[in-house]
């Protein structure tokens, strides 16, 4: 070994080990019990399908139909009724346009905008008095107040009436939580949950877990719907546990943390992240592929951030650009297993895609991975040179290094005919919808990992760049960048409504990816340092059963 090699000083981070051990390796399937549940689910689906159809046929029932659709979506069973829901909302939009007359305009507005219908917010001006303030009488209707609050998170830039409504509803809901704590603790908790995280920003799977017991406590709940939600949860959990067992065994076989002890061992958390993007059964192959790519990306990210020298990273970046097993020999010894695993994940998925003639999809995912490492390398260059980029310069690179362009493109792989060649090209072009998601990912990550990045000799965060560029305090920079996050959420909504050349089931993947961030970066980087709340979520979704 040369003297130069002996003198290498590596800024090694010390990450906590996995909290899960081997508990997900084994999955025992009860086929007979599962078949019995599946039969019950089929019958319940038909019952609910008839409810949707009968409500659609009677105009006076359209308000109740929206309530039914809202419950179906929040209970996590909308994937059974995608066609029926789309037809129902198309009918309602066609019949009423922006002139909804069925009551509860807040629910109408939120449900239609969630589904991609760009309905006007002018209807909320009717809730104001002659002085332009929201009527005080609204505060006596707690559910109406909550519905209005939730609707405000589907606003876009320039919708002042919804901005005012958010301030109004938040103020009064905060007051109500205190008075309701003793008289109606369930409703009080429901309101507190909404104030902490509105539906728009909630992870659908966790919302189902939260909403099922709440819905069951409502006096006039639909019993068939509730039973379907519970049985559906059991079936989904069984599938997800089976998938997690498969990817856990794959990760165990690789044993990459033995060769690379400096990396994060986060297979389970990676699967949870992928589960947030899509939980439906038809996306099983796509979900497992995304989880594997996510896990390997974390290993690569840690190598750029916490271990590799500048020269080594240049070699690795070049090897990824060439994307060939022949490049292994050019790599430092410790990087070879990582590169082999990266190649292996994509080769394995290619075999699956070949069966359906969809192998072309992989080329887009590979291109996005190449781009990601190029941006990792640019950040490594900045860190190596001690360079502090401007906020604009930083974000032009770091929104890509957030990984969300790569994850967006990669999550489409394996979705079959639902995603076309045009959808992949759209994602790689970094359209406003994807860029908004990336900005949210980057800034939320920067808020919670600013201190850790400094300790790892990483490039400074966007917070640091803003502080230096404008000579402001950390608190001021945080407030400015938090506003950027809220602006990005509104951009996300606007693009989901106006981007008509991409189907909603594709755009919803980007929205779901963004919603995962509210869990993973809540208070800290929960992926790196797994917190109790995330552990609770994973246990609830993948370990604990659902009582019928």
UniProtKB/Swiss-Prot annotation:
Query: Required cofactors, per record?
Result: Mg(2+)
Arranged from A to Z, the UniProt key words for this protein are:
Cytoplasm, Lyase, Magnesium, Metal-binding
User: What note does UniProt attach to the cofactor annotation?
Assistant: Binds 3 Mg(2+) ions per subunit.
Which reaction equation describes what this protein catalyses?
(2E,6E)-farnesyl diphosphate = guaia-4,6-diene + diphosphate
Tissue expression, as annotated, is: Highly expressed in glandular trichomes. Expressed in leaves and stems.
Give the principal location in a single coarse category: cytoplasm
Give the record's GO CC terms.
cytoplasm
CDD domains according to UniProt: Terpene_cyclase_plant_C1
EC number(s) per UniProt? Answer: 4.2.3.179
Associated pathway: Secondary metabolite biosynthesis; terpenoid biosynthesis
What is this enzyme's class at the first EC digit?
lyase
| Residue sites binding Mg(2+) 2 per the record | 301, 305
Motif annotated as DDXXD motif, chain positions:
301-305
The entry's (2E,6E)-farnesyl diphosphate-binding residues are: 264, 301, 305, 442
Single GO BP term: diterpenoid biosynthetic process
- Binding residue positions for Mg(2+) 3: 453
Query: Known Pfam families for this protein?
Result: Terpene_synth, Terpene_synth_C
Task: Indicate the quaternary assembly.
Answer: Monomer.
Functionally, this protein is described as follows: Sesquiterpene synthase involved in the biosynthesis of volatile compounds. Mediates the conversion of (2E,6E)-farnesyl diphosphate (FPP) into guaia-4,6-diene.
Q: Which family does it belong to?
A: Belongs to the terpene synthase family. Tpsa subfamily.
Recorded domain comment: The Asp-Asp-Xaa-Xaa-Asp/Glu (DDXXD/E) motif is important for the catalytic activity, presumably through binding to Mg(2+).
Q: What is this protein called?
A: Sesquiterpene synthase TPS2
- Its source organism is Xanthium strumarium
**What is the taxonomic lineage of the source species?**
Eukaryota, Viridiplantae, Streptophyta, Embryophyta, Tracheophyta
* Gene designation per UniProt: TPS2
